[in-house]
Amino acid sequence: MGGDTYGFGGVNRIRTVNVSQEEADFASDSLADDLPLLCCRHYPQASSFVSVLGVCSGWLGLLAPDLFIFVLTNILLSGFLILIAFRAFLSLIGAFARRTSKASEKDKSPPEVLSAAGAQTLPHYSVLVPLYQEAASVPGLVAALEALDYPTDRLDVLFLTENDDTATRQALLAQLAASRSLQTRAQILTLPDGMPRTKPRALNVALHRLAGGLVTIYDAEDRPHPDQLKRAAAAMQAGAGNLACVQAPLYAYNAEESWLAGQWALEYDVHFGLILPALAKFGLPVALGGTSNHFRVSALRRAGGWDAWNVTEDADIGLRFARMGERVGVISPPTQEEGPETLRIWVRQRSRWIKGYIQTWLVLMRQPVLAARQMGVLNFVSGLGLLSGAIGSALLHAPCLVWLLLCLLSPEVGLAPIGQIVLIAGYAVSAGAAGLAPNRTGANRWKLIASFWLYWPLLSWAAAIALYEMLRAPHTWAKTPHALTRQTPQSVQEAFA
């Protein structure tokens, strides 16, 4: 492992480190070696229960196909109806919690809100920034990190780069040279070639280097609220000992640039504005976002770090915390993100998400009885239900739309009453949740709601790609390109003034 310090203006301050192959391999394989049943490196085999259920279903399909279709359809529709009701409940609870939180914060001045994290008690904080082919995003990223309000003697920033990404490292060196506040706090780590080339592999390299305290992750396009670190530290200090992580809300700054970006932003507003706060309120498992989650380093290490082979390491670690008896909370200071504006970018990102959800589902169902015992039955059903719903709805949106069109065009084809209920309830609950969610972007909310039915079938396209990649390239990370939007993000000071 070699390192250099780059000097500018006669002062040597920016440290670069070449990560050894041994260290990188350990980051890739440590979870698989220590907790193999919780890692998706080796294709998870279904449990005996799932295998028996599959065999019985296959025999029923062969012996009585009409009965099989009837039973399967009603089971699926009933499951979706229960899930829709659960999401409606979470949306209402999330809306109430949000209004209560806003009211309580209005009664406090900023110093009082942050009093639990006084200047003398703030823990050491590490900020991890995994980057690949992100040279164009570096100037805005560095400006956003400079704006973070946290004592400089207790803050480290680790930029994680890949061996073949010289352009991003050069951009970092140039920007950091002009940043007096980051020069002494920043390190640039270069990972050697190796498999898998994923974000969690890079994060694990950094995790094993941290001294302790708290750690958070920001992506290249992120613009976090300046108070986010202090608020997270305050939440950790005020929370119970089993509070492993707090999640900050994410929202798109470019929601008005395209219809797809608007729909993506609306999903985020519902997810981070309603669903996650409700799950956290009841202590239910939370599939974390990929950025702006703030962890206790000790909790991450007890969990074995991130799964380097899972392409949605965020969802996976959230469910693993639940299996350990750890909880996830939420904080209010948000992070701006760049939403995908084109179909090509959206499909690449969404297919990776669905592939990762499938990987996470397979790990959870590898030993479902053990998982239920570890998490508690309610937590297990909640986590499994939301994960299954995300995968199942993505797979079925387009086929259901085709079936609905057939029902409308052909009198011979009828839609069962339970199907009608699921269809109406699904749209009604989604529209209601969208109306209750915070509109952080200023996009025309009702135009987006009216076009839900055009957006949802696209999920089936992404799901089909995810299934194909599960067979051909399960651990390949489809990178989402950034810095492509025509809309320039506001400066951090303008955005959160």
Region roles according to the model:
Residues 16-53:
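Cytosolic-side membrane-insertion boundary helix
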Residues 59-113, 117, 385-473:
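Membrane-embedded multi-pass helical conduit in multi-pass membrane proteins
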Residues 123-126, 156, 301, 316:
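Cell-envelope/extracellular polymer assembly enzymes that use nucleotide-activated donors
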Residues 146-194:
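Acidic donor-binding segment of Leloir-type glycosyltransferases
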Residues 176-213, 226-311, 351-362, 452-455, ...:
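Long helical/loop segments within the catalytic core of UDP-sugar-dependent glycosyltransferases
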Residues 219-223, 306-309, 321:
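The conserved acidic donor/metal-binding loop of glycosyltransferases
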Residues 311-317:
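Acidic donor-binding loop at a coil-to-helix junction in glycosyltransferase catalytic cores
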Residues 318-336:
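Catalytic donor-sugar/metal-binding loop of nucleotide-sugar-dependent glycosyltransferases
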